[in-house]
Amino acid sequence: MYQVVLGKVSTLSAGQLPDALIAQAPQGVRRASWLAGRVLLSRALSPLPEMVYGEQGKPAFSAGAPLWFNLSHSGDTIALLLSDEGEVGCDIEVIRPRDNWRSLANAVFSLGEHAEMEAERPEQQLAAFWRIWTRKEAIVKQRGGSAWQIVSVDSTLPSALSVSQCQLDTLSLAVCTPTPFTLTPQTITKAL
């Protein structure tokens, strides 16, 4: 089973959480998205299992919970991918101009990924950049890696993992799962 839930950071970060969990929230710019992610998790699972953190900081449920999850946010949107199949990764990005997006693609995309982007019409290449970027990030996050490892991922190569993605208006969303899953707008739940 896979469950994908999208929500708004600005709304969810004010949601109800136990005081002990709120006390764990980081201060500064990450606080609102951290709280929003925990609210999404607590709405999906009650009670919320105890969490631990991997070497690269990836949150996970403690050993007793046979569930896996991953969170991602961009702008005011947050995504939760929940699984009972194994480790998962997700990435969401607002499709937006970025000053150095072509240079970044040259630096981190494989030849196959670069060819995929260049095959698009010029007006579609920015969306293709974000499509490839989210796919790479989802793979790295499924592995529990850090953003610095994105350059070592070639998302065009065959893999035992399943990667699926879709575009929702101005959002690019990708998921990486251990078993086949097709991400479509119909498979996504919107949090209130």
From Swiss-Prot:
It comes from Salmonella typhimurium (strain LT2 / SGSC1412 / ATCC 700720). The gene is acpT. May be involved in an alternative pathway for phosphopantetheinyl transfer and holo-ACP synthesis. The native apo-protein substrate is unknown. Keywords: Transferase. NCBIfam families: PRK10351.1. One of its GO terms (molecular function) is holo-[acyl-carrier-protein] synthase activity. One of its GO terms (biological process) is lysine biosynthetic process via aminoadipic acid. Belongs to the P-Pant transferase superfamily. Gsp/Sfp/HetI/AcpT family. It comes from the Bacteria. It holds the Pfam family ACPS. This is 4'-phosphopantetheinyl transferase AcpT. GO terms for cellular component: cytosol. Disulfide bonds: none annotated. Signal peptide: none annotated. It catalyses: apo-[ACP] + CoA = holo-[ACP] + adenosine 3',5'-bisphosphate + H(+).
